[in-house]
Amino acid sequence: MNIINKFINRILPKRFDKYWKKIEDSQNIDSTLRYITNSFINSKSYKLTSNYWHVLNISNYKSLSEFGIKKYGSTVAKNYYTFTEIYHDEWFDEVINNLKDSPFKIDSAEAFKKQADFSLKESITYNYLCYLLFYSLKKTNTFQHISKLNDKTYLGFNDPYIKINDTNITTDKIISLLDYEKIQKAFEVKKFKRVLEIGAGSGRTCEAILSIEKHLKYILCDIAPAIYISYSRLKLAFPDKTISLLIDIDNKIELEEKIENSDIAFVFPHQLEMLNENSVDLTLAIDCMHEMDKSTIQYYFKLFSHFTKNFYLSIWEKTDVPYSKNILRKKNKLDYESGDYVIPENWKNIFKEKIVFPSNMLSLGFKIKE
C-alpha cells in the first residue's frame, strides 16, 4: 500500500489549496490569516511553491486551525528552527569543536524541564541544545546583544525555553544571533539602509537584526502562513514602527513608494520582479533555498542580480529536497560544491564558513557586480 501511495503522490503530488478549502472557516483561522492565505493561493507565488512546502503547509495549517497562533512555538515552529530530534552526528561538529576546551555547568532542573506539548525525550534534546548554543554564542562578540531580544515575542507563542544565568533562552534567540554574527562577518551591516529577507519564516532573524541595527528598513518575502506568523510577531515586537502588508500590490511604482514609506514591509516572492535595480543593499536567504527546485533557485538568482548589491546565503552543503520526485524526475539533489546552485558569473564570493549548528550547513556571502 505504501508503494502505491508513493507512486500516486509522484503523479499527483499533494496541493495545499485543496486542504485549505476544508479548514478556511475554522474558528482559529482569523481574518488576517484568511486574507493572506487566499491572496497567496491566487498569486503567481503559489506556482513557485515546492512540493515539499505544499506538504509542510498542510501540517502547519492543521496546527493553526486547531490551536491558532498562540501555540506556534510548540507546533508549527518544529518545521522551522525548533529542533526536538537530532538526526545526524555531523550536525554537532562545529559546536563541539567550539566548546571542547570550554567546560560549562548544566542545571539539572533546566536540562530535564518538560516543555509544554513536548515529550520528555523531545524536551531534553531541546534543552541540551539550548545549552550548547548558548555557550557557543557566549564566545562571540554578538553575545552582548542577547539582552536586546524581547521575551514577549521569543517566548510569547508557547515557545519552549530554559533559563541560563538568569536569562530565558530559546534556540530561536541564539540561532538568530548566530545568524547575525555570520552576516556581520561577511558584511558591514551598519553601512546598509535596506535589507530584504527571502524565506523569512517566523521573523526571528528580522527581529534580532532590527533589535541591534535599529536604522535599517526591512522587507520580508515569504509565502503563507509564514508571512502571517512574522507579521503578527513583528507588530508585537515593534509597535512604533510602520509595518505594511503589501501582498496585493501589482503596480511597480506603488510598491516601491509603499516600501519606502515603511519601516518593515511584507511581500510575496513574485513581487520581487517589481523592485528597482540595485534598490536593496543586502538580501538574506537563511535556511530556505535548499528546499527549492533548481529552476526556482535560478529564478531568484536572476532577480537578485537585478535588485540587490550583496547576498547572504545559508544552506545545507548537500541535500535531497523532500517530495521532489515526480513521474519524470528522480530526487532533486542539491550539492553546493558540485555546482548545483549555479552561482551567476557576476557574483563574487567574499565569505564562506560553516554554520555553528547544524554544522553541515554553509554560510556564504556574495558581492554582486553591476
Feature-to-residue mapping (PLM):
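A short, conserved alpha-helix within the catalytic core of class I
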Residues: 291-304
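N-terminal accessory regions of S-adenosyl-L-methionine
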Residues: 2-169, 365
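Conserved class I S-adenosyl-L-methionine
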Residues: 191-201
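Conserved SAM-binding loop of SAM-dependent methyltransferases across substrates and taxa
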Residues: 202-213
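A short acidic, Gly/Pro-enriched loop at the edge of an enzyme's catalytic core
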Residues: 274-283
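A short beta-strand submotif of the Rossmann-like class I SAM-dependent methyltransferase core
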Residues: 285-288
